[in-house]
């Protein structure tokens, strides 16, 4: 990391109470201040506006124009974004991110508001800079602040806007940008998308519907040659937003996308008062967003959020009884278990329908007339069939009219007006994860399900589980309403640790049903899932995302294959290293089950995929997410390394042409289409790459085995 000091000083001396010293302001015509890490540079002008540059090869690329990158908005709507640069200092620091350098820049606005900007650079994170801002009101009048904004940057559409000709810009067929945005929405939209002119999305990390919210506090925009990302690194979830926009009204050769982080909260800054923002980052990368998520995961691990250990059973394939839906019978499930075992499945999941209601969690007396004894016997039947038993559960929800509401209304999470908060799917209400009574009630349920009934895993399900709104229940005595928001991850930690105390090999799957996973919850589960994907594309993009956030060998479950394209796209899960699963049914009188019947034709296909899965076990390999760009590279490509081989997965409606094989270290590789059992010959490597001529529809799965100097495996 290096720093370019200012060389010329103006003659006027200005007193800066924030630093308790008198500081000399900088000549506004002087060179900009440059704060660098090895791969990224922030340049600040005399008004403390900034722009980002990247050095990820032999040249520096300026990514956009100067912006008012850190500023305040007053209650009246005034932007305070011009701060005359007064001084800058630099010193070495040591933190949980390692040894690094901190540059402090100080500026003052015309109304007397002072800005102290700290920029930290660590060799451990060479393409990233970390930022914190403190504002101090040194004027004699109070300021009412409604919002702070940070990391407001521009990414130009063209690699060099000054030399982009109009014809090139007009004839470009691919999108200018792709983007990853970590917010959650009720329509369960894609987390990764191309940006079209006119695009805008607020990406609020709170609730974007009554029961959809939270997410991963990162936004990333990339063009074909370079990407730009921002995020916050607080150990608690915060109600910030990450707006991403791509205006439609800019000249075609000056097109640019924008992103920033903001927090809307009214704060009165009396004379002498200070306001400090969150710790945030700005990062640059090549190819897609995977490098950003990997960096973010590593940063948060150094700060204390470490992903859970994973038992081998978390990689085993799954059969789920949800094909029979809520009106299942035990005869239906029990007659299906032998077929599940025959196909190579290792888990059987009892889904929704075993309980009388959400909240009470009493056993349905029609299905369990003998109560706990019947449930224990059912679990033993699953184990006798050679399968492990997992149970569905939707905590933090309580149905109207239940004993819990009648006996414990104080457990409810309440809105500001005192009303209950709806969980729409189950027509229920939110419970508050910060309330100790809710926490202990959940602990007792986990002890019953895993300890008394004998289940070896939990499928914790519901879009309401990803985030919760602020709680205004006076019975809870919260320090702030946001206490519920920040307590959710700790609630999951309690559930996870309780489960591990009972069974250290228990599989804890949390399925937030269409939400973008809240990163702060991830350390407290050991299996994620594509959570009701709308398309096979979502299966793949969610897999790439969660491998980035949890680890290259994290057990990500592709969900029931029946939710994929054509209800049979095993390849989208298999090729990215996802756990396979199904909810097939056997003949019965259950109408809901008819669409999932395992007929003889399907059985052959299901058997082939599960046999191949158990043979290869790709989720235990290493997902190489930085080799290909999920947006710009065509065909879409994913790679898993395992046991010395490389497994490439290509996806397209149809493709004929040459495939570029990246990440190769040997001189030659034997290539096999391992799904169809076809020998595709030998490829020779040049500069870590090789090419393979291919013709396929939907998918192509190939294994590359390195050959020795004599051509042997």
Report residues per predicted region.
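An acidic-aromatic substrate-binding cleft motif
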Residues: 291-347, 351, 355-356
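Extended acidic/polar, glycine-enriched regions
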Residues: 142, 236-301
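Short, acidic/polar
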Residues: 328-342, 439-451, 566
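Conserved, mostly hydrophobic/aromatic
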Residues: 39, 133, 272, 319, ...
């Amino acid at each position: 990391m290096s720093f370019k000091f200012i060389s010329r000083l103006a003659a006027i001396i200005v007193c800066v109470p924030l630093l308790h010293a008198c500081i000399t302001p900088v000549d506004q015509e002087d060179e900009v201040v440059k704060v660098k890490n090895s791969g990224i540079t922030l340049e600040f002008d005399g008004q403390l506006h900034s722009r980002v540059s990247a050095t990820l090869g032999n040249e520096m690329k300026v990514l956009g124009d100067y912006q008012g990158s850190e500023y305040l908005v007053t209650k009246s709507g005034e932007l305070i974004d011009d701060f005359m640069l007064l001084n800058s200092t630099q010193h070495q620091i040591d933190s949980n991110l390692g040894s690094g350098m901190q540059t402090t820049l100080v500026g003052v606005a015309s109304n007397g508001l002072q800005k102290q900007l700290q920029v930290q650079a660590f060799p451990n994170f060479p393409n990233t800079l970390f930022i914190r801002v403190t504002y101090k009101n040194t004027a004699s009048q109070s300021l009412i602040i409604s919002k702070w904004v940070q990391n407001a940057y521009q990414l130009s559409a063209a690699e060099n806007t000054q030399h982009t000709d109009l014809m090139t810009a007009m004839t470009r067929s691919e999108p200018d940008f792709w983007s990853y945005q970590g917010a959650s929405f009720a329509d369960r939209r894609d987390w990764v998308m191309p940006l079209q002119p006119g695009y805008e999305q607020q990406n609020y990390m709170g609730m974007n519907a009554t029961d959809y919210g939270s997410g991963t506090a990162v936004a990333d925009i990339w063009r074909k040659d370079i990407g730009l990302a921002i995020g916050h690194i607080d150990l608690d979830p915060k109600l910030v937003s990450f707006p991403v926009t791509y205006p439609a009204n800019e000249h075609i050769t000056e097109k640019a996308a924008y992103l920033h982080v903001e927090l809307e909260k009214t704060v009165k800054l009396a004379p002498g008062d200070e306001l400090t923002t969150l710790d945030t980052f700005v990062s640059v990368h090549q190819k897609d967003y995977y490098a950003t998520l990997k960096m973010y995961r590593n940063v948060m691990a150094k700060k204390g959020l470490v992903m859970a250990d994973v038992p081998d059973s978390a990689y085993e394939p799954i059969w789920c009884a949800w094909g029979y839906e809520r009106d299942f019978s035990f005869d239906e499930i029990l007659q299906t278990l032998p077929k599940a075992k025959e196909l190579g499945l290792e888990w059987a999941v009892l889904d929704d329908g075993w309980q009388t209601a959400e909240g009470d969690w009493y056993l349905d007396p029609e299905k369990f007339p003998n109560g706990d004894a019947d449930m224990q016997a059912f679990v033993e039947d699953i184990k006798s069939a050679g399968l492990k038993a997992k149970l569905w559960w939707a905590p933090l929800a309580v149905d109207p009219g239940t004993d819990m509401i009648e006996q414990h209304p104080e457990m409810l999470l309440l809105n500001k007006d005192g009303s209950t908060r709806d969980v729409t799917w189950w027509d229920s209400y939110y419970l508050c994860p910060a309330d100790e009574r809710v926490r202990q009630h959940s602990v007792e349920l986990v002890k019953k399900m895993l300890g008394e009934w004998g289940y070896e895993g939990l499928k914790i399900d519901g879009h309401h589980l990803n985030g919760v709104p602020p709680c205004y229940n006076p019975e809870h005595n919260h320090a702030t309403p946001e206490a519920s928001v920040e307590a959710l991850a700790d609630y999951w930690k309690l559930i996870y640790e309780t489960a591990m105390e009972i069974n250290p090999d228990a599989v804890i799957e949390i399925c937030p049903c269409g939400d973008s996973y809240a990163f702060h919850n991830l350390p407290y589960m050991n299996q994620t899932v594509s959570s009701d994907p709308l398309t096979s594309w979502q299966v793949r993009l969610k897999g790439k995302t969660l491998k980035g956030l949890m680890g290259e060998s994290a057990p990500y479950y592709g969900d029931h294959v029946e939710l994929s394209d054509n209800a049979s796209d095993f390849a989208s899960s298999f090729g990215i290293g996802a756990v396979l699963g199904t909810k097939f049914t056997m003949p019965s009188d259950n109408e809901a089950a008819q669409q999932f019947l395992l007929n003889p034709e399907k059985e052959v296909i299901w058997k082939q995929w599960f046999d191949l899965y158990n043979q290869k076990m790709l989720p235990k390999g290493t997902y190489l997410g930085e080799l290909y760009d999920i947006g710009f590279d065509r065909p879409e490509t994913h790679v898993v390394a395992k046991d010395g081989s490389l497994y490439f997965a290509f996806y397209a409606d149809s493709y004929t042409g040459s495939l570029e094989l990246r990440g190769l270290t040997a001189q030659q590789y034997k290539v096999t289409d391992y799904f169809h059992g076809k020998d595709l010959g030998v490829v020779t490597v040049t500069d870590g790459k090789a090419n393979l001529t291919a013709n396929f529809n939907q998918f192509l799965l190939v294994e590359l085995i390195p050959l020795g100097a004599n051509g042997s495996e």
